[in-house]
Amino acid sequence: MTEHIQDENKLIAERRAKLEHVRKNCPANGHPNTFRRKHKAAELQAQFGDKTKEELEALGFQTAIAGRVMAKRGPFLVLQDVSGRIQAYADKGVQADLKDRYAGLDIGDIIGVEGTLHLSGKGDLYVNMERYELLTKALRPLPEKFHGLTDQETRYRQRYVDLIVNEDSREAFKMRSKVVAAIRNFMIKKEFMEVETPMMHVIPGGASARPFVTHHNALDIEMYLRIAPELYLKRLVVGGFERVFEINRNFRNEGLSPRHNPEFTMMEFYMAYADYKDLIDLTEEMLSSIAKELLGDTKLPYGEHVIDFGGPYTRMSMLEAIKHYNPDNATIQAMTYEEVKNIDFMRKLAKDVGIETETFWSCGQLLEEIFGETAEPKLMQPTFITGYPADISPLARRSDGNDFITDRFEFFIGGREVANGFSELNDAEDQDNRFKAQVEAKDAGDDEAMFYDADFITALEHGLPPTAGQGIGIDRLVMLFTNTHTIRDVILFPAMRPQA
């Protein structure tokens, strides 16, 4: 390790010396900003890739390209820009001039090249270096592995290097951008209005999670980074905007895992005069449409599985799912909602399936934990799980036929939750009581229980029409579309512990 650091320091020193040479011999202190590119690599490949050598010679096509030097192969330089790669040819005269002006070029340097487009003997396009300019001298060498970094932590800490050398990473983040754009376009076509709501809240709400706390100096009050935009978006529906959506960050002061990052992106939307079943239909249509648009198919590989977004998706209640994935457990097979309402029964059952419980957990929390332990990891294909207990769904409307559960679902793919939606609770008095129950739970030790939000109750008292709302985790959805299995691979700069 020490030898590697010494070698790297030697290379950096050599490059700094070259930069000093450039500063003395070139304008703009060695960092010019007048070169203008005419074409990207992919544009030239698409337009001229099928031409013969003779056809290109006859065309005499002049171009200007710019990019990072990724390899040197004899007289050829491999340049990389955002679209791909193309070669530049330096004859002996050019090579001598490069050495004289720049003390030679290194891997990682960024250059601009003007010249005629040609075809090499191996059938590769290249630009003859007739005019050229060093635009940025790279002072640090790229990793020795041409096809990417081997150390995962370095990839996350130095994403800029990862993006330079790892094509898979570049493609993953291009796909992320396409997924977000496709979702936005889908929602706009469905007549939803995109809005922006506060990122700092006086009262955190909209989800059960531990918030980040900050201090507003001018107001001299504690504020919270938002854990969800839900309560503000529903205020907008009260105000008359019947279809709204927001794509933005949420912050939850919780642990790191392959599926959790404290800062993550959600698309949350609300539609008046709809219920949770309408959300399910809309979600199926959205994901099927996006898969076809971006991948050309509704089926995509994910690890050892093939995820089918074609629909219709599986739908079952939480209780049904627990029974389905525990066929040999006689107690579970005989369980009804009457048993689920019995706290002693649920604690014993949770213990029997290997769950360490908290004393303040309710019957609904215990049911959800049993589901998460025994059923959730097995939900590989798109599946809507309905029938969430009211005591863990403080913002959802109670089901008409069973007031223990709500008109809520969570959507699972690949063994993890991707979305959460429900028919909204628009009964101001019921919401008031549920907020009070959440305060009691927080006092009993549940750090993730919600706060009481008096202004939101006031908003509901003005009248929220029948409404359904849903949040979709963008990061987890992108994991599926890019066949990656850790959330850090689809977040450009994931949370990391500072280096010593």
Curated annotation (Swiss-Prot):
HAMAP family: Lys_tRNA_synth_class2 (MF_00252)
One GO term (biological process): lysyl-tRNA aminoacylation
EC numbers for this chain: 6.1.1.6
Record-linked SUPFAM superfamilies: Class II aaRS and biotin synthetases (SSF55681), Nucleic acid-binding proteins (SSF50249)
Cofactor comment: Binds 3 Mg(2+) ions per subunit.
Keyword field: Aminoacyl-tRNA synthetase, ATP-binding, Cytoplasm, Ligase, Magnesium, Metal-binding, Nucleotide-binding, Protein biosynthesis
Quaternary data: Homodimer.
Swiss-Prot/TrEMBL cofactor(s): Mg(2+)
Residues annotated as binding Mg(2+) 2: 417
Pfam families: tRNA-synt_2, tRNA_anti-codon
NCBIfam families: lysS_bact (TIGR00499), PRK00484.1 (NF001756)
Chemical reaction(s) catalysed: tRNA(Lys) + L-lysine + ATP = L-lysyl-tRNA(Lys) + AMP + diphosphate
Residues reported in the UniProt entry to bind Mg(2+) 1: 410, 417
Protein name as annotated: Lysine--tRNA ligase
UniProt superkingdom: Bacteria
Family: Belongs to the class-II aminoacyl-tRNA synthetase family.
GO terms of molecular function: ATP binding; lysine-tRNA ligase activity; magnesium ion binding; tRNA binding
PROSITE patterns recorded: AA_TRNA_LIGASE_II
Localization annotation: Cytoplasm
GO cellular component: cytosol
